[in-house]
Amino acid sequence: MAKKAIKKFKTAFTELLGKYSYDDLTIVNVSDAAKVTRQSFYYHYESMEDFVFDVLRDELDEAVNKERRKSGTLTATFVRIISACRASKTETSNLYNSSLKEELVDFFNNYIEDLIREQIGALLQASPRTMSEEALQFVTAQYRNMFRSILEDYIRTGMKEKPTDIGKGIDRFVGRSLDQVLTDFSDEAE
């Protein structure tokens, strides 16, 4: 029953967010639309925000796909994220233009950083090299800030560009793969 209730909540929320502003939605609205009790909602989630970020994490994880997270390029993974945002354009815009905006930007920041760290870990495991913690933090922060800024600007300006065009622009701008960047920042390169 728990998985069914959660699925009903998520489906109802997504449908409601496509029609109404996030700030106008309540747990009562979502529970009524899902035809599940509020008590059931609170059994699974502490708050509406907790629920929203669970929905977002699931949607992005599905778009990114756990297997492709480590094997694809970082840009390709990012393109899948912005494609998922564009596929849910109304819902994404409603969340971004709500009282949840700051938390949403923080969520994307953390989500993107986790993906970058996973990919760095996979690359360092496949091709071992020594890097200082400072170098790892610097590379992670630069990629995170770039991707977060692009994503935030993309949402803010209405998600008009094709995600693949953004990916091509990133590749042209960066000019090399994450693996090459890690090699350049490795202790062996010094």
Placement of each model-derived feature along the sequence:
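Regular secondary-structure segments
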Residues: F13-L17, L60, V64, R86, ...
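C-terminal peripheral helix-coil segments that are non-catalytic and often amphipathic
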Residues: R156-E190
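Amphipathic alpha-helical segments that line or abut small-molecule/effector binding pockets
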Residues: G72-T90, A141, N145, S149, ...
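Residue at a beta-strand N-cap/secondary-structure junction
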Residues: S21-D24, K160
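Amphipathic alpha-helical packing segments from all-alpha helical-bundle domains
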Residues: E102-P128, E134-E152, D179
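An amphipathic alpha-helix adjacent to DNA-recognition modules
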Residues: A2-T14, D23-D24, D32-K35, Y42-T75, ...
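Secondary-structure edge/capping motif, primarily at the C-terminal ends of alpha-helices
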Residues: K66-E67, K89-S99, I120-S127, Y154-G158, ...
